[in-house]
């Protein structure tokens, strides 16, 4: 059996970013989400295995900023803020590619890391995915995502600019999975920043949100 594609997200806004990314990827098939809080004890491996048994094609895990390593290598690691956290250091060593926020002071050096790096930024033209024509709305954040010659308007369900970096990071991680900006835009327009519609794992830890999203309609049923 082919192992699911795995994306690990770390840093400020990790849970929201992971939730948005899960709903984007659900357009390609059942996608599992495990969002851990700082009070979660242990690794997310039991949750990921449970989601694998439910035939998830892809898995997204949001790691707390406290130490919490994975027991497997991530296909893509999203570092919203790098710093010196143990989880961030593990991800830099234990992934096949990274998405790094160039607007974070600690993110700039990591673009020259040992694995391919996709960079995001609000204004830096050298980033792989940038934002322009930002609109701050009461209930959404809208901007044009620019990747090379591709331009697509994203509408993220977070108010007053709070959706900028989660939206950019989710779209960049989706690109590494083969999802186009246009497809991400369609999914984000129907997405929620919290796991509304997610079908939860039974007997899950009270310190984690874990379950899966199905392809029909964006999130679960």
What are the language-model segments listed below?
Residues 213-220:
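Active-site glycine- and acidic-residue-rich loops that bind
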Residues 2-12, 41-42, 50-56, 62-212:
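Acidic, Mg2+-coordinating active-site environments of NTP-dependent enzymes
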Residues 18, 163, 217:
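Short, conserved glycine- and acidic-residue-centered signature motifs
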Residues 1-46:
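Walker A (P-loop) phosphate-binding motif
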């Amino acid at each position: 059996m082919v192992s699911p594609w795995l994306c690990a997200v770390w840093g400020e806004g990790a849970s929201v970013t992971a939730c948005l990314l899960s709903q984007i990827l659900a357009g390609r098939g059942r996608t599992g989400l495990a969002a851990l809080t700082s009070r979660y004890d242990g690794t997310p491996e039991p949750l990921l295995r449970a989601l694998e048994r439910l035939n998830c094609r892809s898995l997204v895990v949001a790691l707390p900023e406290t130490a919490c390593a994975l027991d497997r290598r991530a296909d893509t690691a999203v570092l919203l803020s790098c710093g010196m956290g143990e989880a961030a250091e593990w991800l830099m060593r234990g992934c096949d590619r990274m998405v790094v926020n160039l607007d974070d002071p600690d993110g700039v050096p990591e673009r020259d890391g040992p694995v391919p790096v996709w960079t995001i930024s609000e204004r830096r033209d050298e980033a792989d995915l940038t934002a322009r024509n930002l609109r701050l709305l009461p209930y959404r954040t809208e901007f044009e995502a620019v990747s090379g010659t591709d331009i697509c308007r994203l509408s993220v369900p977070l108010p007053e600019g709070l959706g900028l970096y989660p939206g950019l990071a989710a779209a960049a991680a989706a690109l590494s999975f083969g999802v186009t900006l246009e497809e991400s835009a369609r999914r984000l327009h129907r997405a929620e920043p919290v796991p509304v519609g997610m079908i939860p794992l039974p007997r899950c830890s009270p310190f984690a949100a874990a379950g899966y999203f199905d392809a029909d309609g964006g999130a679960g049923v």
